[in-house]
């Protein structure tokens, strides 16, 4: 684009210079002729004045027609690159994972630069280097995550299943403990209420007659 503009500028300047020189030569010859005829030479009209090379109508028309493109070419943005087909790509380096994060492709360099600024604020906070520091504002907190009805039902069923499993384990553990405690109590009661066997007296070496009654004889 700049090469085309400079080429057109040179062509216009050369043409203007040629026209001005031709007008100057014709006016000088006319002046000589008037002097030879005795007529005073008139001043050169202002329309034939030399065109100022600093005034370039082509560049002015191009800047008026494409003001945004002219500004974008003058300024380079951080984290923004132009694709060969004209789009603008934005990317940023993640300081936590040490990897580049793709932010997308945009129609203008300014939009890509603003996307980079938002990502830089998320990654680095107040230490971020921005393209538009004058437009920094406190970002609102992200909206709460809305769950779909299917996710809500699935989470509720999973929670109920976990609660039921925990309750079942609690019942099993309490039932085993009560059974053992009941068995221990019954065993202790049996030992407490059962009569203890008395030890037998020591026996003598031989049978004693006093211990046995005398047999009775039948009457005759």
UniProtKB/Swiss-Prot annotation:
Gene3D superfamilies: AP2/ERF domain. One of its GO terms (molecular function) is DNA binding. Residues 15-36, 48-72, 176-220 are annotated as: Disordered. One of its GO terms (cellular component) is nucleus. Residues 57-72 have a biased composition (Basic and acidic residues). Its main location: nucleus. Residues 76-133 bind DNA. It is found in: Nucleus. GO terms for biological process: ethylene-activated signaling pathway; positive regulation of DNA-templated transcription; regulation of timing of transition from vegetative to reproductive phase. Keywords: Activator, DNA-binding, Ethylene signaling pathway, Nucleus, Transcription, Transcription regulation. PROSITE patterns: AP2_ERF. InterPro entries: AP2/ERF_dom, AP2/ERF_dom_sf, DNA-bd_dom_sf, ERF_plant. Residues 19-30, 205-214 have a biased composition (Low complexity). The keyword Transcription applies. Probably acts as a transcriptional activator. Binds to the GCC-box pathogenesis-related promoter element. May be involved in the regulation of gene expression by stress factors and by components of stress signal transduction pathways. Belongs to the AP2/ERF transcription factor family. ERF subfamily. This is Ethylene-responsive transcription factor ERF110.
């Amino acid at each position: 684009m700049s090469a085309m503009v400079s080429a057109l500028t040179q062509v216009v300047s050369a043409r203007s210079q040629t026209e001005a020189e031709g007008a100057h030569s014709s006016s000088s010859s006319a002046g000589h002729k008037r002097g030879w005829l005795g007529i005073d030479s008139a001043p050169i009209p202002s329309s034939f004045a030399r065109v100022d090379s600093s005034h370039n109508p082509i560049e002015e028309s191009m800047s008026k027609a494409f003001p945004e493109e002219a500004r974008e070419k003058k300024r380079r943005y951080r984290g923004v690159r132009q694709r060969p087909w004209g789009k603008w790509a934005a990317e940023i380096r993640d300081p936590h994972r040490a990897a580049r994060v793709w932010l997308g492709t945009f129609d203008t360099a300014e939009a890509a630069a603003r996307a980079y600024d938002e990502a830089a604020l998320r990654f680095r906070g107040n230490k971020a280097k921005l393209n538009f520091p004058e437009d920094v504002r406190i970002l609102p907190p992200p909206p709460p995550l809305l769950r779909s009805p299917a996710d809500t039902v699935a989470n509720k069923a999973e929670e109920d299943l976990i609660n039921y499993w925990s309750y079942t384990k609690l019942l099993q553990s309490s039932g085993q403990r009560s059974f053992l405690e009941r068995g221990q109590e019954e065993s202790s009661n049996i030992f407490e209420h059962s009569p203890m066997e008395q030890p037998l007296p020591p026996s003598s070496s031989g049978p004693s007659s006093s211990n046995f009654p005398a047999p009775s004889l039948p009457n005759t």
